[in-house]
Amino acid sequence: MKTLYSLRRFYPVETLFNGTLALAGRDQETTGFAWWAGNARLINLSGKLLGAHVAHAGLIVFWAGAMNLFEVAHFVPEKPMYEQGLILLPHLATLGWGVGPGGEVVDTFPYFVSGVLHLISSAVLGFGGIYHALLGPETLEESFPFFGYVWKDRNKMTTILGIHLILLGLGAFLLVFKALYFGGVYDTWAPGGGDVRRITNLTLSPSIIFGYLLKSPFGGEGWIVSVDDLEDIIGGHVWLGSICILGGIWHILTKPFAWARRAFVWSGEAYLSYSLGALSVFGFTACCFVWFNNTAYPSEFYGPTGPEASQAQAFTFLVRDQRLGANVGSAQGPTGLGKYLMRSPTGEIIFGGETMRFWDLRAPWLEPLRGPNGLDLSRLKKDIQPWQERRSAEYMTHAPLGSLNSVGGVATEINAVNYVSPRSWLATSHFVLGFFFFVGHLWHAGRARAAAAGFEKGIDRDFEPVLFMTPLN
């Protein structure tokens, strides 16, 4: 048997039938895991596991940079972003880079810079990943005790948790600083149809910020997804960043209490399951946010939300028929309800027809036409601006519907166009990934609990049929 760098390499779990197969010196014999078990071979090799994580970060950042440059290369300034299948440039535009009034792109150079910076960063991370995977020390405990750890060392684990929380808090403050001091962010609610502005009057009232968490997730309430002004969003990031940083300091300075030591499983696989569970919650929340929220995800870049496209259609035909002489206040539709306008269950004047179910939509092109009791009839007759008509006609024809083969629009519509909204892509992908991560959470939590309880993980390999077959090679 080979001389081991660290005695903690032994982790016998599975038996590979072909024991001679070795991969880069990390074989079944020395790790207890077969080559296909991936990072499980590195559970007790902190140096190699560091390499795997840094290399993975490099791949992520490389994708971001390459995809960013790909989108810049294909970008047509004359078309809205949401018509071009872009998923990265809308995020940069939302942060206020390269856009002017109405969400019009005035400069693509910041997008190019972003892509190049990510590519350069990915090269650094890639080098670090390869170095630690192949050349660096297998374990960090002996040479660099600050970066070393033992999975069951509860104090060290909460210290690592604290460092991560501080980094997340600093990330939240990066958005705050961008909005306050570095040019501002794009505000879809700015007068006249959206603009980049600095957020000066932050919402820091805890009753408002934490009130979102106490709202119902249904209907017009919408939990945190209902946030509809940037002051609240940036103020929320101040609160969240502060909580993360203070919580991080707390976890670095303290040891877990007895109830926490008893309640949790303290192993590498358990921490993996906790992380996957958290990411699953992030994915499901992001799905709801990108689907329903047109403030954090402005419609100028991501296309209209479903309710927004529906209300835009009602508005467009109200404008048309009013010009043709219809009395939109009293016209009756085929159901006996108002054809253009009707009353909501609570008495507000809302758009009639099928779009009545979306009556709690709020959108910057529509709100100026509301009064104290819903839509204001006199404003609908006298105050509609050309930009509102143009925008609603555009949104009406770009509903976030569409199939994977890029045939957009209503499924029964024969004149459908090649259009799938980025909202559809981002909401669907985050829902599906959130679900997969949840399954991964259950899987690894089950394995971690089984290991902690002391019963065998996996299947008994002693009498596995493949052990008695002739090797393929």
From Swiss-Prot:
Taxonomic placement: Eukaryota, Viridiplantae, Streptophyta, Embryophyta, Tracheophyta
InterPro entries in the cross-refs: PS_antenna-like, PS_II_antenna-like_sf, PSII_PsbC, PSII_PsbC_sf
Biological process annotations from GO: photosynthetic electron transport in photosystem II
Family: Belongs to the PsbB/PsbC family. PsbC subfamily.
Membrane-topology descriptor: Multi-pass membrane protein
GO CC, alphabetical: chloroplast thylakoid membrane; photosystem II
Molecular-function GO term, any one: chlorophyll binding
Keyword Calcium belongs to the record: no
Protein name: Photosystem II CP43 reaction center protein
Spans traversing the lipid bilayer: 69-93, 134-155, 178-200, 255-275, 291-312, 447-471
Propeptide: 1-14
Cofactor binding remark: Binds multiple chlorophylls and provides some of the ligands for the Ca-4Mn-5O cluster of the oxygen-evolving complex. It may also provide a ligand for a Cl- that is required for oxygen evolution. PSII binds additional chlorophylls, carotenoids and specific lipids.
Positions of [CaMn4O5] cluster binding: E367
Keywords: Acetylation, Chlorophyll, Chloroplast, Chromophore, Manganese, Membrane, Metal-binding, Phosphoprotein, Photosynthesis, Photosystem II, Plastid, Thylakoid, Transmembrane, Transmembrane helix
Organism (species): Nymphaea alba (White water-lily)
